[in-house]
Amino acid sequence: MSTGRTLAYGALGLPLAFAALPIYVHVPRLYAEHAGLALGLLGGLLLVARLLDAFSDPVLGWLADRLPKRGLIAAALLPLGAGFFLLMHPVEQNPALWLGVALVLTYLGFSAATIAYQAWGADLGADAGSRTRLVAAREGLGLLGVLLAAALPSLLAPNLADGLATLAWIF
């Protein structure tokens, strides 16, 4: 497999990793400070969303084995993008419900995209060497996504809420 195709495959690793970090690093502070949610409630919502994710992942894996991977990835990016955008724009009315719905959408889309993406990489590699290069491209660009997600909110705006709102538009 050519270097260009390997990097093209790995490119999706950047936005997927870009989406994951803010949920744990920035969202609790954002919802505590700007929506007034108690940290215990925030932790509970994050836990429930992840527990739902634990039940959906086997189903998503089963689907990834039976459906075209690229189509599943494309379909998964819709709830991921919508959920991420909603997460970064807390509302004043019912912020806990808003956060819960946004987390479920984000996690569902993220899990579906990630599971299908990793399965697709296994399918693309003709041998162990090519699969290793695909994983290296995916993980290397994913690391770049983590670095960008960590740095951009503070570089984009003088406060967390505005930085995350801008980050959501970039995503």
Where are the model-predicted features located?
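Membrane-embedded alpha-helical bundles of multi-pass transporters/translocases
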Residues: 1-171
